[in-house]
């Protein structure tokens, strides 16, 4: 019986543990007086106003309770200080219960209910008394031992399993009691434990609801409901009648509470006997134990978790990995059991952290603490039913943290202890916050660094695997890289048929084997349509109507091409005019700018001229000096005569050269003058003189030639004296006429020259000194050179 009870409690504890992850289960430590063995009894989920019972035997000293109730913090010495902590929560969707037909576990654990509120712990010292059912559906502890509490668990030595007893809860508080009958010895032990805790409790601290004194053997206990649903159209199931479901857990860190009456709606009925003095003393004692309790929390968590998994493995044969994060347990339950644990698991994880652990010494005797339910909105978890990777860091959103902190602060008596209860969640959240902070710091560093396209694409590919670098290639570059062909080239393309208006990408068959429709024919060029018609006549016999239609189509195509060409020519003409107009506008603008500059310069020059004339008018002496510059040469006769003579001498006397006219070379020699060598003073003056000499020579030569020709004419008119030129016939008889004629001509030419010489120079005209050619000299001195 003990083995079956432990197995059922372990299986039910696992299912309830999935809804209460961080030590939110109820502690039921049933210690048997007879066998001196610590048995981990049943752990059952409860409603919003549920409670748990720790049955400890004082005779066994309960030395092993610290391992099972490690977070209860010295509950063995405070067994009588029973404080009930309740939260008004809502009923959640039940989890299907794991059944085991081999062990006889079945209908007694059909449904497991979880609550968003905290569970309760009750340390009740029990004995080996039996339980009997009352007429009103409740059970009573009797001394006869006719019935056993196993009737509620459907666990008996015979192996018969019955359905759990469903007891409806009425509004009458007297009907909501589950009474136990205890022995005087147990009551005395309870009184001794209360005195050891310095609570100064009188008999009223353990006074039952019927108002009897402390020696009464009856204890009242709230009944844990079992679900019953009533469905309405268009609404979710509503729980109306709670049922009893005793629960126990291998471990729990929950506070003990006195036995009180709780309504079905979750409201609280204050205990009948409340001793304020005892409450104050108890608070002082409890506050002293807070530090020790908080220090032991972290050490006990590992032992509790280990015990949970070992108990689970012994019961079901399977256990999740040793990790307390609610994501792992969530996925584990989803993989191994049917149902949806998200309603009971995730909400319980945070809401049940209030008033859960280390509250045994903080609460008053006979005081009921109620915490209002905190609304908790959990974010949507992506793929919650997939296996969760243990190595992946688990993150809790900040809104969960804020709701958990707000729910923690809702209980005024447990503010110092809830931080230790939420160590696992807060550490997970802190890790998540550290990751977020690290990511934000990395982002700030990346912003400060220069942008790298490769790193950005890699990061984007890691986020979006289907990302393609060429996907966002803008078509603007292709459009901007349009061809810069001239309009004449475009016109040639149109004429050649390369670019067609309305031409599809598919090539049109112009082989003539197939008769094309009107639409296809109109898409052809003039050359293509000519080829098409010629080939079509070769393969087909056309009627007159078809030929007329082809002619019309060909005419349309040509007209279209001509129109396009004319438009293109007109366009080109207009563009050329526009370019010329732009050029003329530019030239006009430049000319205007030059004209403006010239006007400005003219104005400036006029201003300078006006200023000079004004200065000359104002200064007459300056005007006279300025007028001498432009005055001509004086009108003196002497100066003009001397200048004329000098010019004449310079031209005809100083630079005169005798002509080489010699009528008789023996008698008359050319007149020669020996010119002195002139020193070159300046190159400019020498060049001027040289030019004047050349001109005078030409002039003198022209005069001499005219005289020479006139004299020759006069000589030719006078008769020749041929008496001296008779040919001796005796000596020259054998000569011919030709030779005689030549001689006559030669002798006649010599005679003419002699005659001319005689005529040109007569004895009368030539002076006595110059008769001889050898004595012909000039007695005049040489001219001095020009300065």
UniProtKB/Swiss-Prot annotation:
Main location: nucleus
Swiss-Prot/TrEMBL keywords: DNA-binding, Nucleus, Transcription, Transcription regulation
Protein location: Nucleus
Chain spans, region Disordered: 18-95, 153-173, 186-306, 343-372, 401-441, 473-507, 723-747, 763-787
Leucine-zipper: region residues: 605-612
Gene3D superfamilies: 1.20.5.170
Disulfide bonds: none
Keyword Amino-acid biosynthesis: no
Domain bZIP: from-to ranges: 549-612
Compositional bias (Basic and acidic residues): 763-778
Region (Basic motif): 551-603
The UniProt record lists the keyword Magnesium: no
GO MF assignments: cAMP response element binding; DNA-binding transcription factor activity, RNA polymerase II-specific
UniProt-listed Pfam families: bZIP_Maf (PF03131)
Cellular component, GO, one term: nucleus
GO BP terms in the entry: regulation of transcription by RNA polymerase II
Signal peptide limits: none
SMART domains linked: BRLZ (SM00338)
Positions with biased composition (Low complexity): 18-90, 186-223, 235-258, 273-305, 351-366, 473-483
Family: Belongs to the bZIP family.
Role according to the record: Probable transcriptional regulator.
The protein, known as: Probable basic-leucine zipper transcription factor J
Taxonomic source organism: Dictyostelium discoideum
């Amino acid at each position: 019986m003990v083995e079956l009870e432990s197995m059922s409690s372990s299986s039910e504890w696992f299912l309830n543990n999935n809804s209460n992850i961080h030590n939110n289960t109820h502690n039921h430590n049933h210690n048997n007086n007879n066998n001196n063995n610590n048995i981990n009894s049943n752990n059952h989920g409860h409603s919003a106003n549920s409670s748990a019972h720790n049955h400890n035997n004082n005779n066994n000293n309960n030395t092993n309770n610290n391992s099972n109730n490690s977070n209860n913090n010295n509950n063995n010495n405070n067994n009588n200080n029973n404080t009930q902590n309740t939260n008004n929560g809502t009923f959640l969707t039940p989890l299907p219960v794991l059944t085991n037909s081999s062990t006889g576990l079945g209908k007694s654990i059909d449904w497991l209910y979880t609550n968003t509120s905290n569970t309760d712990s009750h340390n009740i010292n029990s004995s080996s008394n039996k339980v009997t059912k009352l007429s009103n559906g409740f059970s009573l502890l009797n001394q006869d031992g006719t019935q056993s509490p196993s009737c509620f668990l459907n666990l008996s030595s015979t192996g018969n399993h019955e359905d759990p007893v469903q007891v409806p809860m009425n509004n009458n508080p007297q009907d909501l009691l589950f009474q136990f009958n205890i022995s005087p010895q147990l009551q005395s032990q309870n009184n001794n434990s209360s005195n050891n805790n310095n609570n100064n409790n009188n008999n009223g601290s353990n006074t039952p609801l019927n108002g009897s004194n402390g020696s009464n053997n009856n204890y009242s206990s709230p009944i844990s409901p079992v679900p019953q649903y009533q469905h309405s159209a268009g609404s979710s199931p509503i729980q109306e009648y709670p049922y009893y479901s005793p629960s126990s857990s291998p471990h729990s860190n929950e506070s003990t509470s006195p036995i009180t009456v709780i309504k079905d709606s979750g409201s609280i009925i204050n205990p009948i006997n409340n001793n304020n003095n005892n409450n104050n003393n108890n608070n002082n004692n409890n506050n002293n134990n807070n530090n020790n309790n908080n220090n032991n929390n972290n050490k006990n968590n590992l032992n509790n978790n280990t015990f949970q998994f070992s108990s689970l493995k012994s019961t079901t044969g399977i256990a999740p990995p040793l990790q307390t994060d609610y994501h792992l347990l969530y996925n584990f339950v989803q993989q191994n059991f049917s149902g949806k644990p998200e309603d009971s698991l995730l909400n319980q994880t945070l809401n049940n952290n209030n008033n859960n652990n280390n509250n045994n010494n903080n609460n008053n005797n006979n005081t009921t603490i109620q915490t209002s339910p905190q609304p908790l909105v959990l974010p949507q978890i992506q793929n919650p039913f997939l296996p969760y990777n243990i190595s992946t860091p688990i993150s809790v959103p900040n809104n969960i943290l804020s709701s958990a902190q707000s729910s923690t602060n809702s209980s005024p008596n447990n503010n110092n202890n809830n931080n230790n209860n939420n160590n696992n969640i807060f550490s997970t959240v802190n890790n998540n916050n550290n990751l977020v902070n690290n990511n934000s710091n990395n982002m700030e560093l990346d912003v400060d660094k220069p942008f790298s396209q490769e790193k950005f694409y890699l990061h984007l590919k890691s986020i979006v695997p289907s990302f393609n670098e060429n996907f966002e290639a803008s078509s603007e570059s292709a459009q901007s890289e349009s061809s810069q062909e001239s309009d004449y080239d475009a016109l040639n393309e149109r004429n050649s048929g390369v670019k067609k208006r309305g031409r599809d990408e598919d090539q049109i068959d112009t082989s003539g084997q197939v008769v094309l429709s009107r639409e296809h024919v109109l898409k052809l060029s003039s050359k293509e349509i000519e080829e098409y018609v010629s080939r079509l006549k070769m393969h087909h016999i056309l009627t007159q109507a078809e030929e007329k239609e082809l002619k019309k189509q060909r005419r349309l195509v040509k007209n279209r091409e001509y129109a396009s060409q004319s438009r293109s020519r007109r366009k080109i003409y207009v563009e050329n005019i526009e370019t010329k107009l732009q050029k003329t506008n530019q030239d006009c603008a430049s000319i205007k700018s030059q004209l403006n500059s010239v006007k400005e310069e003219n104005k400036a020059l006029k201003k300078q001229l006006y200023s000079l004339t004004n200065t000359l008018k104002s200064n007459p002496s300056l005007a006279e000096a300025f007028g001498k510059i432009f005055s001509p040469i004086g009108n003196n006769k002497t100066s003009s005569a001397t200048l004329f003579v000098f010019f004449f001498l310079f031209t005809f006397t100083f630079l005169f050269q005798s002509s080489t006219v010699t009528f008789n070379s023996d008698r008359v020699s050319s007149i020669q003058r020996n010119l002195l060598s002139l020193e070159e003073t300046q190159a400019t003056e020498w060049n001027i003189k040289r030019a004047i000499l050349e001109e005078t020579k030409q002039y003198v030569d022209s005069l001499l030639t005219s005289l020479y020709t006139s004299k020759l004419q006069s000589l030719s008119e006078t008769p020749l004296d041929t008496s001296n030129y008779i040919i001796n016939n005796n000596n020259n008889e054998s000569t011919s006429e030709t030779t005689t004629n030549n001689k006559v001509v030669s002798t006649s030419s010599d005679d003419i020259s002699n005659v001319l010489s005689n005529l040109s120079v007569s004895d009368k005209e030539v002076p006595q000194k110059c008769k001889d050619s050898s004595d012909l000299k000039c007695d005049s001195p040489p001219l001095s050179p020009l300065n």
